[in-house]
Amino acid sequence: MGESIMANSTYVISATAQVNAPPRRVYDTIANYHTGHPRILPKQFQNLKVEHGGIGAGTVITFQVRMLGQTITFRAEVTEPDPGRVLVETNVKGSDSVTTFIVEPGDRPDSAMVTISTVFQRHPGVSGAIEKFVTERVIQPMYAEELRLLESVAASDEQGRA
């Protein structure tokens, strides 16, 4: 379901799942920060607010993540390097992590393969190794839940990008 790759001073946590909904609808659900994206967030993600835009590239959001007894506030800018297929959230507050959503056609016309992956900065030493170990075990289940919620939302309605 997911993987962790070590590369230099970063590591990646990702999860991939087949979503039983058309790729366009899946992508539009992810890209719509007004009505789609809020409905796919696991309970650890709270207070998602759109500061600017709200549909795909140019969107600026703030949100909080509660895990391990702490709440961290994030601010992220959204880009679409490959609109309709790749959406990227680059954190500019709270963390320097970058999360990428990739939507590809599934094995049927009405399905999509979706990957959520985040690149984290690795901190040096033992504390960095512990942080990576804990982060992997906390984030993996959150991404699995987000993919389950995405399937439920995208399969049940049509979000649209307008």
Listing of model-derived features with the role each one plays in the protein:
Residues Y11-V12, P22, F63, V88, ...:
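Residue-level detector of alpha-helix boundaries and kinks
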Residues L48-S95, S111, G125, E145-A162:
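Glycine-rich portal/gate segments that line the openings of hydrophobic small-molecule binding cavities
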Residues A15-A17, F74-E80, V98-P105, T118:
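Hydrophobic/aromatic beta-strand elements that line small-molecule binding cavities or substrate pockets
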Residues V88-E145, R161:
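Beta-strand/loop substructures that line and gate deep hydrophobic ligand-binding cavities in soluble
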Residues G2-H52:
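Hydrophobic ligand-binding cavity/cleft-lining segments
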Residues V19, V65, T118-F120:
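Hydrophobic beta-strand positions in extracellular immunoglobulin-like domains
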Residues N20-R24, I55, E80-G84, I102-M113:
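A short, structured loop/turn motif at beta-sheet edges
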